[in-house]
Curated annotation (Swiss-Prot):
Gene encoding the protein: pheT
Subunit structure: Tetramer of two alpha and two beta subunits.
InterPro entries reported in the protein's UniProt record: aa-tRNA-synth_II/BPL/LPL, B3/B4_tRNA-bd, DNA-bd_dom_put_sf, Fdx_antiC-bd, Fdx_antiC-bd_sf, NA-bd_OB-fold, Phe-tRNA-ligase_IIc_bsu, Phe-tRNA-ligase_IIc_bsu_bact
Protein name (database record): Phenylalanine--tRNA ligase beta subunit
Ligase among keywords: yes
FDX-ACB domain sequence ranges: 701-794
Domain tRNA-binding: start-end pairs: 39-148
Enzyme Commission number: 6.1.1.20
Residue ranges of domain B5 in the record: 401-476
The organism's place on the tree of life at top rank: Bacteria
Places the protein is found: Cytoplasm
């Protein structure tokens, strides 16, 4: 926001320099981006009166004038401006004046006529870019007075960055409040007294959407002269704020917008049919805006309409049909409070961003509308004439924002600031900020002012007290930290350790968005409902992820499209699952996921080009599970998963509890996602693995180990893992190692069966095992396999 320093000083005028004022505003939390002079450096320019203006005898486009500048005689000045005429008050650069750019004015002859000065335009004084003609000063401008003094050009424009929470500072009044509070000065408001109605004319107003528009004020003003000139003082204030003067009606509404931060709009009363209705648009309803753009409205867009058609997008942009023009004689002034949620996003949807929408989206003071409409009425009548009717007020009090009541505890204040501020000073700061304060012992209860939407919790009051007290007034105290050795649980396995292990195995960590494409996610999880964002960044980022794989697989496609054929990626992060039993109906699980694609090894002269398979990723995952000390409790069970290949996937169980899955991406899904070649994925719940099993010390046997090999024939559907587990269970005291070293199908083995060759390593910690004991243990294993799996020894 840009504003004039002198305009600000009309409200509050601290006895400090411009630079100090800018620094003070920054320290109050409103960062100053720039301070610039409103005009160039010049001198010797005074107010003059055009006494005579005639045609130059030797030039069609020049005029010869006689100018009264309050001296002993009239000055002869040649001027080429098309708007130069007799009776005009102008800015005259006399002989000896120095204009911006070190341009010195000297007496000269132009086409044979003497010229003793120059009549100046705004651009020649570096006030603005307007060079269409000379400056036209008000008729009551005193002759001979320095133009710099008369136009208050020893002024500066201050531009500040207003954070979204400080919408109250999108008007001079908000900045002035902060400056007044910091300097402990009163606020001098301009006259905003009620304008007594001189006519009884009103227009019926109906609000059909009170939640979106809790307050709507309308006032009829009749008999105005739109062709009246906007006063120079108002045009200058608007210009210094970066607003171009258009006509007096628009200028008045813009002036009130900049002064109070309240957007206003003026409708041509004679173009409104029946009355005003504030309602939601019907889907596809069309409106032609003031700039001639045609828009199709959505059903959630608030409009100001009459009994036949929409007139304006509420709080955003006026309509062309009801706009004020040169023929307008009667207007309806609008001053309203629109709920920020009813305005947010609607302007962007149509490629718009207006001063009004900028303020309404952030929030306007709901107590400001009466003050604004009275101020605008008075200014409009003073400039354009006319008669005002009574204000029609349609307010739904229950829908207006409620002022927050906040308790501030002394203990919290001192702890967060780290400095003790006297209680009387705290109370004074809160009251000067506009809060209604009740002192409760050492604490305070404060009711936030209507213009401060950002005051909602105790920390907000702490921030305000510290801000006004001055961060620079809080003494620097070295932080005292007692070094206490933290306890480290041996059972804790950090996620960082696991990430390091994956990096060591050739993986790269990926970080993807928690917002994913709902269409892609539906392919991976067709049976699960996801959380859909009401205001997404984009359509393809509108769902919260149910799995890390949605983002990881998109990353694989992205990299493959950029000539990366061999990929090893992993990611850790939250998934968001709708769950009525969880807090806020959302369960958040920390997940660890990985994906591999391409060849097993980088291209090498001594290595064959082998594509990755299921067991490559399973081996990497088992290495991670080994770190947890729980690998022996983990089972990989063949279970169907809609996103995975039915014959090359498995569910992962830990001590009987499902914790994840692993497998090759389903060929159909691979095609739909545009994956290039076989892709293998895994995902596990990290919370189930974060506590590792601490290894227990045990004695290493000094006695020889004995190996015995057996080959058993079992049905094809019997998992080898179950066979090995049964052998470990039966020979628990003596079998120290079990390994599957061969799988055979073919001659000698019936169809539907397979032969598993298993090595059993037997050892005792106290003695050397006898052959009879070894044979007995092996026989027990074979018998157990026969009983449970109908296994038989292979001949």
């Amino acid at each position: 926001m840009k504003f004039s320093e002198l305009w600000l000083r009309e409200w509050v005028n601290p006895a400090i320099s411009s630079d100090d004022l800018a620094h003070q505003i920054t320290m109050a939390g409103l960062e100053v981006d720039g301070v610039d002079a409103v005009a160039g450096e010049f001198n010797g320019v005074v107010v003059g009166h055009v006494v005579e203006c005639g045609q130059h005898p030797n030039a069609d486009k020049l005029r010869v004038t006689k100018i009264d500048v309050g001296g002993d005689r009239l000055l002869d000045i040649v001027c080429g401006a098309p708007n130069c005429r007799q009776g005009l008050k102008v800015a005259v650069a006399t002989v000896g004046a120095v204009l911006p750019g070190d341009f010195k004015i000297k007496a000269a002859k132009l086409r044979g006529e003497s010229s003793e000065g120059m009549l100046c335009s705004f651009s020649e004084l570096a006030i603005s870019d307007d060079h269409d003609g000379i400056i036209e000063l008000p008729a009551d401008a005193p002759i001979g007075v320095d133009v710099r003094e008369y136009l208050h050009l020893d002024d500066k424009t201050i531009e500040i960055s207003v954070t979204p929470n400080r919408a109250d500072c999108l008007g001079i009044i908000g900045v002035a409040r902060d400056v007044a509070v910091v300097n402990q000065l009163p606020l001098t408001e301009p006259d905003m007294a009620e304008v007594v109605a001189s006519i009884n004319d009103t227009l019926p107003i109906r609000v059909d959407a009170p939640q979106a528009c809790p307050r709507y004020l309308g006032r009829v003003v009749k008999g105005i002269n739109v062709k009246a000139a906007t006063p120079l003082w108002m045009r200058e204030k608007l210009r210094r704020c970066g607003i171009r003067s258009i006509d007096p009606v628009v200028d008045v509404t813009n002036f009130v917008l900049l002064e109070l931060g309240q957007p206003m709009h003026a409708f041509d009363l004679d173009r409104i049919s029946g009355g005003v209705i504030v309602r939601l648009a019907t889907e596809g309803e069309e409106l032609t805006l003031l700039d001639g753009t045609k828009v199709k409205l959505n059903a959630d867009t608030l409009v100001i309409a009459d009994h036949q058609k929409p007139l304006a997008m509420a709080g955003i942009f006026g309509g062309e049909h009801s706009g004020v023009n040169e023929e307008t004689r009667n207007v309806l002034l609008e001053s309203a409070f629109f709920n920020p949620l009813s305005i947010t996003g609607r302007a962007r949807r149509h490629g718009l961003h207006t001063d009004a929408s900028h303020r309404y989206e952030r929030g306007v003071d709901p107590a400001l509308q009466h003050k604004a409409i009275e101020r605008a009425t008075r200014l409009l009548i003073d400039i354009c004439g006319g008669e005002a009717g009574p204000v029609v007020d349609v307010t739904t009090a229950s829908e207006l924002p409620k002022q927050a009541t906040i308790t501030l505890r002394r203990e919290k204040l001192d702890r967060l600031i780290g400095h003790h501020i006297p209680s009387e000073q705290v109370s004074d700061i809160l009251r000067r900020l506009g809060c209604k304060v009740t002192e409760c012992g050492s604490d305070w209860q404060a009711v936030a002012p209507s213009w401060r939407f950002d005051m909602a919790i105790e920390e907000d009051l702490v921030e305000e007290v510290a801000r006004i007290y001055g961060y620079n007034n809080i003494p620097d105290v070295p932080v005292r930290a007692d070094l206490v050795m933290t306890k480290h649980r041996e059972a804790s396995l950090s996620l960082k350790r696991v990430k390091t292990a994956l990096v060591d195995r050739g993986y790269q960590e990926a970080i993807t968005y928690s917002f994913v494409d709902p269409k892609v996610q539906a392919l991976l999880h067709p049976q699960q409902e996801a959380l859909i964002l009401p205001n997404p960044i984009s359509v393809d980022m509108s769902a919260m992820r149910l799995s890390l794989l949605t983002g990881l697989l998109s990353a694989v496609v992205y990299n493959q499209n950029r000539q990366q054929s061999r990929l090893r990626l992993f990611e850790s992060g939250l998934r968001f699952v709708p769950d009525n039993t969880a807090d806020l109906g959302i369960r958040q699980d920390v997940m660890l996921a990985g994906v591999i694609a391409g060849h097993r090894y980088d291209e090498h002269w001594d290595l064959a080009r082998q594509p990755i398979d299921f067991y490559d990723l399973k081996g990497d995952l088992e290495a991670i599970l080994e770190l947890t000390g729980k690998l022996s409790d983990v089972q990989f069970r063949a279970e169907a998963h809609s996103a995975l290949h039915p014959g090359q996937s498995a569910a992962i169980y830990l001590a009987g509890e499902h914790i994840g899955f692993i497998g090759v991406v389903h060929p159909e899904l691979e095609r739909k996602l545009d994956l290039n070649g076989r892709t293998v994925v895994f995902e596990v719940q990290w919370n189930k693995l974060a506590d590792r099993a601490v290894p227990q010390a045990r004695e290493i046997s000094r006695f020889p180990a004995n190996r015995r090999d057996i080959a058993v024939v079992v049905a094809e559907n019997v998992p080898a893992e179950d066979i090995l587990a049964e052998c470990k269970k039966v020979g628990a005291n003596q079998v120290v190692g079990v390994n599957l070293f061969d799988v055979y199908r073919g001659k000698g083995v019936a169809e539907g069966y397979k032969s598993l060759a298993i090595s059993l390593v037997l050892q005792d910690t106290a003695r050397t095992l006898e052959e009879e004991e070894i044979a007995a243990t092996v026989a027990k294993c074979v018998e157990a396999l026969k009983q449970r799996f109908q296994a038989s020894l292979r001949d």
